[in-house]
Amino acid sequence: MMIRYASYFIAALLPLLLFRWFAPASVGEIDFWLLWLVAMILVSLPVVYAEIALAYRSVDAPLAGMQKLTREADASPIWRSFGWLAALVSIVIAALVISGASTGILAALIELNSVPAIPSFALAAGLMVITILLSLLGVAPLPIGLGLMVVGLLLGVTNGLPTIDFAMTDINLSEWARAVALALVSVGAGTGLYWFGQNLVTKQVVTAVDANTQNSARNRAASEYRASKLVLPIWILQLVIGVVALLLSGMSLPPIGQLLYWVGVLFVVSYLLHYSTQQLAHKFGLLISLVATFVSALILVVAV
């Protein structure tokens, strides 16, 4: 049941996870809101449509599916690099977020006068170990992470909402760039997360053993869905949560709220590591992929 809603959890979590780093200094700029809405229509919506369509067409995960589709279309092998790039980008995003979580947790502990007697890089490495272990649970940590993040934000709301003065300002290139960046963040920056989520649903539906029955079952599974029926709810959820995330981007959280928020972030980021591990497992096997993902992310976390 949880697998079926993985894409919706991701649609809700990505804005909450990443918008705080991309939000404008003043979220009251009406022109920025309009630019972001245009970017959501022109960038986010087509990307989600494309990922769902590719999931239907390939009936496989992004890395294996892209290799399959390029062979069938006799396309340039360079397109096969998309799957590898998606796995790499997921690891990089996870490492950056875990590094940010380490800083946030340390700041909250300082406010609580409970600073651990360990170096900051050791704390980041410890959080990395916890996150990679959580990644073994697959989709299960997503609702837990969402719940913790929401509770943390609600504790911030009890201290008062940030004051926002809405005004129309001049449109400039940096606003366009920020609006497009937020739209890309909403869809995971092209990591193929929605493609992967739809593939999980398809694999869950397919339960037959022999090849012929399996193929027919997959065809039936694909025919049960329509692209718009899946894409529009995901896109609307991205839009609604994105608005909330932008409005709350300037809000300060109390120490306990910060701890809950960042612990929830670790649960969410574990899914990114799970995703990258599953992609690499297509080529190297699960154990080697898990170790490679852990080592790569750990190096990035400590380096940052």
Q: Where would I find each of the regions flagged by the language model?
A:
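Juxtamembrane transmembrane-helix boundary signature
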Residues: 35-70, 196, 272
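Alpha-helical transmembrane segments and their helix-start/interface "positive-inside/aromatic belt" motifs
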Residues: 1-2, 30-37, 76-88, 136-149, ...
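Membrane-embedded translocation segments of transport machinery
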Residues: 141, 150-304
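Inter-helical loop and helix-membrane interface segments of multi-pass membrane transporters/permeases
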Residues: 23-27, 62-88, 93-143, 157-181, ...
